[in-house]
Amino acid sequence: MLTLLSVGAAGSALAQTAPAAWLTPSVSLSETLTTNANRIGQQAGESDAITRGTVGFNLRSRAGRAQGALDYAFSGLAYARHAELNTTQQTLNANLALEWWEKQGFLQATAQIGQAAVSAFGAQPNSAGLPSANSTEVRTMSLAPLWRGLLIGDLQLAASGQVGLSDAQGGTQGDSTTRQLSLQVSPRSTGPLGWSVQASRQSGDFRAGAATASSRLYGSLSRAIDDLDLRLSANTGYERGNQASTQQGSAGTWGLGLTWTPTPRTSADMKYDQRLFGASHAVSLQHRTPLTIWRLSSSRALNESGSSLGAAGAGSLYDLYFSQFASVEPDPSRRADLVNAFLAQNGLAGNANAGTGFLRSAATIENRQDFSVAWRGIRNTASLSYGRSQSQRANPSLVATDDLTASPSVNTETWSFTASHRLTPSLSASATVSLQSGNGVGLGQSSRQRTFSTQIGGPLGPKASWSVVLRRALFETALAPYGESAAIASVTMRF
């Protein structure tokens, strides 16, 4: 327990003494020895040595009304035997919370760049980021402004919007633009009984498919039962749109909700809505202890984005430990630094537990269930995650090019287990086992990918670190199965 307390104390002290904004450049060099460089089938697999050089920077800001982080890296990959595979890659993870008008105007912005799978039935991207025939670079961005102001008497008006962009390199599949605009009137003062009236407009436009749009007007009532730490809600209204058919349709909508927060560490949120595209629900259960975090969720919702990059799911290791460290550091910005330091100290990848996905060319109905748990001890950590999803075309009669072209539904499943142990204060070892599968009804729409990896590494002085990874991957499919063994050595320096 002393080590955990020292990690928290050191992280909090570092966060409190850090400047309002700072920039940390970095460079890294890695060498990968692989038995299957192009990952296009066991018969065609050839060994190779792949050199990756990366330059990047980390920007943090806690300057007053602007709170945010930006992590960017640019990599060049050189193949010793397959020069035609030489390429470049980018990674970006950025978020910004801006208060542009004191206590009234706010902006939430996010941006991501990363490798994503084109098909759920092909080889899924791995943590090493090596390209394959089924991966492409995807860029996503979201801007969500909000303004709140006094309307008349005790009534307030909230106007919000959201614009989301998804762009996949090398084609139009996965390229989409989503827009949402909402106006809400509600009482300024809160009490046991609450109400609101809201009008919204949302749309999705796919470059390789059709555009959809809907308008909705509804009213909501909520009732807080403080003795039970419970809040009940209900809504009813009207919706019109073309998300589920080629023609405009309309229907009445209604929904029920329940939020239960018996302790600061335990929460349950349940919602059910009957919408124009059908039934939707969102269930989320979470409980954390001083050393563990438990999550269970289920949802059925309309998805008008072309990419799954950054989508909610079982949660990455970073997401899990970010929630678990809430009692150690309540401030989100400082907690992010603490979690990153914890992951680095234990040799863990923050983006682990990534699920199976594919690029979409039309609006889909996503039905998914996720479970995850993470534990941290004095020198050990362990995490387990499971996720499954079923994707269907929101409009079954729509013709678009993606995995749903030849199958009415795409089913994916992901298991992942990671454990780590700190051998010494400057040496950590970890191991990960994962299973990913994708299934449809079309020819060749079935695959299973198993990955086993171990890692050892640690710091090289105050500003450098090293790691060695051994990986074994097995990809099973009727069309192009393959196996790969790889060893990866890397060195990173921060300035």
Locations of the language-model features?
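Gram-negative and organellar
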Residues: 14-495
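Gram-negative bacterial Sec-dependent N-terminal signal peptides
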Residues: 1-15
